[in-house]
Design a protein with these regions (language model features):
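Membrane-proximal helix-turn-helix segments that form the acceptor-binding/catalytic region
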Residues: 35-40, 62, 85-102
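A conserved catalytic-core segment of Leloir-type glycosyltransferases
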Residues: 1-41
Length: 184
């Protein structure tokens, strides 16, 4: 019975999208919908892609009994630089506790999951983000050589945990030791 839920004139739940003021309510509503879908559809595995979807994945697992595999791009330890939000941590940990498989984007993230969230290393695997190798045509393009200079390029996301401020901080540390580096 979902009579307590707010629905529109068509009897549908409306989602705000983005990061609304009622984010946790949105996460809960999404979880309810996942449970309904899990009861009605046939599937083999549940994949929850980052902490916002972990409650939905857990709910679908409880309803269906199917295995839950979660994807961890970053933890709140990474995003907050150690100033962890207890609510977010709780959601992340609950998702990890219920997961049958935890896919982490790096070995560093895997170690964070194991040690900060107390997860069994046997169910945690590092699955690195990757790119396709350059085609031979691109590899054959002549490059300007700077034999005495090393080049470091920022390719991160413009967010706190991967943002340019880390690049600038790292550049300052490197330049304290050597000057033959170009940052771009």
């Amino acid at each position: 019975d979902f009579s307590y839920m707010h629905v529109n004139d068509l009897g549908c739940m409306e989602f705000a999208g983005g990061y609304p003021k009622n984010l946790h309510e949105e996460i809960n509503n999404y979880s309810i919908i996942a449970g309904v879908v899990a009861r009605q559809q046939e599937f083999d595995i549940i994949h929850a892609h980052d902490w916002l979807t972990y409650p939905a994945g857990v709910h679908a697992k409880m309803v269906s009994g199917k295995p839950l595999c979660i994807h961890v791009h970053a933890t709140d330890f990474d995003r907050s630089r150690g100033k962890v939000n207890p609510t977010v941590y709780s959601i992340e940990k609950d998702g990890m506790d219920h997961a049958d498989c935890i896919m982490c984007v790096s070995e560093l993230t895997r170690q964070t999951v194991i040690h900060q969230y107390h997860q069994d290393p046997r169910k945690c695997v590092a699955m690195h983000n990757a790119v396709y190798p350059l085609s031979q045509e691109l590899q054959d393009i002549p490059r300007v050589e700077h034999p005495k200079e090393k080049v470091v390029t920022f390719l991160g996301r413009i967010t706190m945990q991967k943002g340019p401020e880390y690049f600038v901080e790292a550049a300052a540390l490197v330049l304290q030791r050597t000057r033959n580096i170009r940052f771009c």
